[in-house]
């Protein structure tokens, strides 16, 4: 299969590791399903398994998940998808967001901790759910509580020394926070949100990572499905109650109309190359030299087909300029005060 060969050969070294990863990886947030604080609505596990296996068959060689996705369910689905596969992908997961009966019935289901014992317990639980002996990349999900990040990072460094994880990284950290923990142990990678609608990391964080050989695997390059080309106002209106996007400003007016207008520009640019709007959105993030690879979610095999081409697609300079012009001419609208 030619596309599998093409995707597989476009690998990049992740930071200070020996891992050569494909330009896009499979993001497993949505396959955690609904019925939790940051859920995406109901999800068929068979569709999830098919999506993962199809992505791997097409050459994607890494999966990013987290213990908290679906309150452990995402990791279990990943394990199911990998059963019996001879060639296993790299598996990345994350810690720091935990749940228990104490918090289950409260409005905020998730409790955050970077205490030594908590991190160790999370790792053991992730290894069990993923059915793995070692995690390829173990990441702190959020720098919260901030006064515990040193203790959490020291614990990850110790787990690496013990051989339970191969490399360690962080997600959603600022430059100042990375400076603090880098005195304890080197950072292999940062996982920040980055898309044409969320560019806050461009000024300081991405240049810092590039300067310090910290790999960058950005999440939400398609803004949680908004830039895929499949999103409409009608579809947004029909989001289930347990889909976190219902309450996100980018999926509400006045931003929604502006964002869907951007999608039409991406559709126009992509059509000249046989690419989807989502592939254009992903390729735009990969154009930044500080970005190693992008995390891309899919909930079924068909969605994988709509994003796989981003691994090799490169935007022309004039196309990048058209996107920049649109974003400049159409700033984020502010909802009028009542």
Model-derived regions: residue spans:
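Active-site groove signature of glycoside hydrolases
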Residues: 127-145
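Beta/alpha (TIM)-barrel catalytic core signal, keyed to glycine-rich beta->alpha loops juxtaposed to Asp/Glu
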Residues: 3, 143-328
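A short, structured active-site edge motif that brings together acidic residues
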Residues: 88-100
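Alpha-helix N-cap and loop-to-helix initiation/capping positions
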Residues: 39-47, 73, 77, 110-118, ...
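N-terminal binding-site loop/beta-alpha segment at the start of enzyme catalytic domains
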Residues: 1-89
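Short, acidic/polar
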Residues: 41-55, 113-130, 174-180
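Acidic (Asp/Glu)-rich catalytic clusters
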Residues: 16, 80-87, 128-131, 160, ...
